[in-house]
Amino acid sequence: MYKIFIYKYISLIIILFNFTCKKFDLIESSLLEEAIVNGNLAQESFTRSLSFTNAWLGLRDSESELIPSNINNKINLWEPANSGADNYPFMVLTAYLLDKDLYHGVLLEMLINEKKLTSRIGSLPDVYSFTKNTFENENLDLGNIIFGASEYIKDGLMPLNEFIGASPWQDRMIEILDDLYIHINDFDSLDEYFIKSSQVEEINGEMLQTLSRVYWMTGDQKYLDWAIKIADYYLLEVDFSNVEYLKLRDHGCEIVGGLSELYMTLHLLSLEKKYEYQPALYRLLDKILTFGRNQDGFFYNSINLKANQVIDNRIADTWGYTLNAFYTVWMTDQKSEYLEAVLKPFQSLNNSYRNFEWEPKKQLGPLGSQDGYADAIESGINIYNRMQDSKLKTWIDSEIQVLFGMQKNSGIIEGWHGDGNFARTALMYGLWKTQGAHLEPWQPSVKIGAISNEDKTYFVITAQDDWEGQLLFDQKRHKTILNLPEDYPRINQFPEWFTLDQDATYSIQSNKEQLIGKYEGKNLKRGVALSLSANEQCVILVKKTPNLK
């Protein structure tokens, strides 16, 4: 269907190109062609995400109106660490972009019900049973409550917060975090609650990431102090570079990312604490590079750093999550080995890692679970945002089609909470193909694609039916929402592509003459009003103009 649509508009591109050459400076037909192709890819991404959202909404419990963790053995449970962390938030983000009625209606009501029904210790959530109409576990398990809260915040509410900003979901995130702060001393004894050390490291890694970001967002010193308390243990009190079990895939790699985020924060604040941490952090990262990778530069699932041995030699689908840490430390210290580590996997992606079994689950087929593909592709997109390598781009464009092929006609992917990761990565991919812009209101018959080239960005909006609305550009969300001085790579962030600077001036050229002119960034932030007739195509070229003041 999408290829047919592309071919249908190739002739239109040529006609449009001949027309717009008279109006645009040095326009390239290949860029317009790529922007239109990107529009088709983006629309497929968005359509699939909305199909996922509607399918899971159909599984809501009739009384609580919450979604289950999966459609099999946990059909009667809402779990903060699963339903809340993985599925629900990306239903919300899908609706925010594509269906505002759904966003302000059913999905907001779900948040209200989640808070009312699942809060167990203050605002801290616990597993809720639809059949019991109360908590699944009669006895309170503080360890599992802390785990569920940390997952819900970092994996679910934080990505929403970083994209949307101030909202009821941001409020929920902060109230849970502040109630976790009440139990700060219980974090010192997490190993009493969990058999696997990787679960403790996952929680602490999630907290380091959350606390570093919320510190910048709020300026509240207590969050930074808490993060330092956690990092002191790993980098000053024990030799974590000598740990006997380090998991480098999800549910373990978070600690490496968390330590790097705090390290970046200390660097940006010019605090001496950074240099106290530096030797231990370098030892950890250097040993991961030496003993934790295969010949292609991909990380093993788990390693023993005390014995310098590989425990699980399967390749981690979250390869980019760990590389985020290396890139972040490279940003602070310009340590060349860490940048080389980020670049190395690009060389073998297309030869050895297409149709790769990232997360083996034989009952699902030879490619395993879609969750592995979702994480692996997210890994690539976030790195591509920083290192725009053509080999990486080719691999992402290839493997997203493998991922898309795993969705059922119903909209369900595999029927468990990991389905949300499909939508997360699909949205991430689609927003790359629109350079972060979106249309409001969205409708299936109107597509937007974009491509950036040097200092210019081309947007092509193609309407099959009459449409009236706005073209909305992305903002520098790391600044406007998180107040971050640097946009370092973060797990589960939605990368920024073309972003407005509200203090800059932009020139717009277009085949719609009424749009041509100069605009202040603060005015463009409100969007560009558009009205398109059926079968009309609008091209908009946006370029930042020099500040002559």
Please place each PLM-identified region on the residue numbering.
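Sec-dependent signal peptide recognition
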Residues: 2-12
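Glycan-recognition and catalytic cores of secretory/periplasmic carbohydrate-active enzymes
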Residues: 24-548
